[in-house]
Amino acid sequence: MKHYAIQPANLEFNAEGTPVSRDFDDVYFSNDNGLEETRYVFLGGNQLEVRFPEHPHPLFVVAESGFGTGLNFLTLWQAFDQFREAHPQAQLQRLHFISFEKFPLTRADLALAHLHWPELTPWAEQLQAQWPMPLPGCHRLLLDEGRVTLDLWFGDINELTSQLDDSLNQKVDAWFLDGFAPAKNPDMWTQNLFNAMARLARPGGTLATFTSAGFVRRGLQEAGFTMQKRKGFGRKREMLCGVMEQALPLPCSTPWFNRTGSSKREAAIIGGGIASALLSLALLRRGWQVTLYCADEAPALGASGNRQGALYPLLSKHDEALNRFFSNAFTFARRFYDSLPVKFDHDWCSVTQLGWDEKSQHKIAQMLSMDLPADLAVAVGANEVEGVTGVVTNCGGITYPQGGWLCPAELTRSVLELAQQQGLQIRYQHQLQDLSRKDDGWLLNFAGDQQATHSVVVLANGHQISRFSQTSSLPVYSVAGQVSHIPTTPELAKLKQVLCYDGYLTPQNPANQHHCIGASYHRGSEDTAYSEDDQQQNRQRLIDCFPQAQWAKEVDVSEKEARCGVRCATRDHLPMVGNVPDYEATLVEYASLAEQKDKAVSAPVYDDLFMLAALGSRGLCSAPLCAEILAAQMSDEPIPMDASTLAALNPNRLWVRKLLKGKAVKAG
């Protein structure tokens, strides 16, 4: 059975107030002056004070072994802010810090440790506010309005480095080789780690470490670094520094899932919903010029136009990729929404998923057996539900404490207004008819004989994604659904959380005293006309799931208030994020893939054509992380996801899985 909770650090604080690991019998930082040691060993050892002003790129990437209390990160962040203040016109504008931690501190222990360094308080408080829950994998934190990115990888560094996507290869400008002393934690200091550091290091990239142990120096040399000794900090006689003089050969183990970015920084996004809005922000943060083409006269008139949508993860005991993606997508979404400097109706009131029949009870029991962190999900008994949710249901379930509801339409509009302030250009009433390569870019033909050319194009237009020749074979489908808007009642007004059953019911929105109940499900349909049958079915499903609940019978749908939308979905319930694959070329190039994996070429795709689609019914949960993943890929930056989960998001995945097994592939 796979367990999803990460063990927190087992520590105590000594007489000096320094945290000490009970498991490794070692301090997290020097009792004497940990802050000055960090500045000397890691910032000085990597010559960052000299390199920052001379860096020829807008992004500087630092990787670290062992996040611990975050002292190295906070010290670097402080130094980076000082650099930006002194050199506002420098090419370098953003800092990206990647760190691996097997036993993360609790938020409380982190805050206690940070009391040691009052001068770092402004940065430490921001880190504490976004400190993630103990889930395995990558947690991306966007700090200082996106100028600083922190990727926290929770798990064993030697296991994680073998799971990294190729997007991290040759990206690291400086390594902080830190952690408990080699004698205290020999399992970390391995040749496997040294080789991974070399693989991730950019040509000209450097490393620094506090130790001068001979096996560490020899291991790093064997990996490809040129090493030298330097005077150690304080009473330590020596430390090690190194440089990666030249690029190492980097074979790709899964070329069929390879992701390519773009050397250009100008893009058109086709869409008008939450996916295109969030992608616009993510690209603008990276310095792109972005134009959004929306088919309607205003944004959020499609699937993103609902009054209330539930935010909670999609979990399944039997699907590793689904769990890894949605658990991290959910926590990223909460951090992202909380940090957005815009207003939109929302209430993080929690979500309770109820076991209303034997099948749903079994599913919930399986989820609870995965040892999920209590911050993510907790069991709630039938006798506890009324106290938690405010209404009687006579069944137990699982509660997502950090879940809730938000208004997708308001969110989309507010994000686009923010993006326009940052330079986004929007063209409404532009219905894309087709697109084709022209010179080194794309020619877009819109209805009404309107045309435009752009270097890069992203399709983020929901269920209309497959209407073009390049995307017509994608295995996606449309789902039409109707959400009913119902007036509150004295009993319904007691509902404190979002309820999920064979449908969902939101607490009332104070802005209109209405609840949302839904949604009907019509696979393969794009019909958005009001349906009285759907209206009655939404009510009846609630009554059928809670037959003894009088409040359910009082639900009134007679006002005929509803909203109909169309979602885009996939068979495996995961989004499609990445390059648009070339279907015909994939079948030709991979005709013998099952027998000739070692000879496979990189996945056939359309150059500079990307997609963000098939968010299904969990778009509010998945869209922020999907936008971040795609923007990072397009910009050739580190992607915050492991290789196997990224493969599960690749738009070509359903074809490639069959081809790897020697099975025939059909379009659609």
From Swiss-Prot:
Highest taxon above the source species: Bacteria
Listed GO MF terms: flavin adenine dinucleotide binding; oxidoreductase activity, acting on the CH-NH group of donors; tRNA (5-methylaminomethyl-2-thiouridylate)(34)-methyltransferase activity
Any Pfam family hit: Methyltransf_30
Broad class of where this protein is predominantly found: cytoplasm
Protein name per the record: tRNA 5-methylaminomethyl-2-thiouridine biosynthesis bifunctional protein MnmC
Stretches the record annotates as tRNA (mnm(5)s(2)U34)-methyltransferase: 1-245
Record GO cellular component, one term: cytoplasm
Organism, scientific name: Escherichia coli O139:H28 (strain E24377A / ETEC)
Cell compartment(s), UniProt: Cytoplasm
NCBIfam families: MnmC_Cterm (TIGR03197), PRK01747.1-1 (NF002480), PRK01747.1-2 (NF002481), PRK01747.1-3 (NF002482), PRK01747.1-5 (NF002484), tRNA_MNMC2 (NF033855)
Alphabetical GO biological process terms: methylation; tRNA wobble uridine modification
Cofactor: FAD
Primary role: Catalyzes the last two steps in the biosynthesis of 5-methylaminomethyl-2-thiouridine (mnm(5)s(2)U) at the wobble position (U34) in tRNA. Catalyzes the FAD-dependent demodification of cmnm(5)s(2)U34 to nm(5)s(2)U34, followed by the transfer of a methyl group from S-adenosyl-L-methionine to nm(5)s(2)U34, to form mnm(5)s(2)U34.
Keywords linked to the UniProt accession: Cytoplasm, FAD, Flavoprotein, Methyltransferase, Multifunctional enzyme, Oxidoreductase, S-adenosyl-L-methionine, Transferase, tRNA processing
Listed InterPro entries: FAD-dep_OxRdtase (IPR006076), FAD/NAD-bd_sf (IPR036188), MnmC-like_methylTransf (IPR008471), SAM-dependent_MTases_sf (IPR029063), tRNA_MAMT_biosynth_bifunc_MnmC (IPR023032), tRNA_MNMC2 (IPR047785), tRNA_S-uridine_synth_MnmC_C (IPR017610)
EC number: 2.1.1.61, 1.5.-.-
Region of interest (FAD-dependent cmnm(5)s(2)U34 oxidoreductase), residue spans: 270-668
Catalyses which reaction(s): 5-aminomethyl-2-thiouridine(34) in tRNA + S-adenosyl-L-methionine = 5-methylaminomethyl-2-thiouridine(34) in tRNA + S-adenosyl-L-homocysteine + H(+)
Family membership noted in the UniProt record: In the N-terminal section; belongs to the methyltransferase superfamily. tRNA (mnm(5)s(2)U34)-methyltransferase family. In the C-terminal section; belongs to the DAO family.
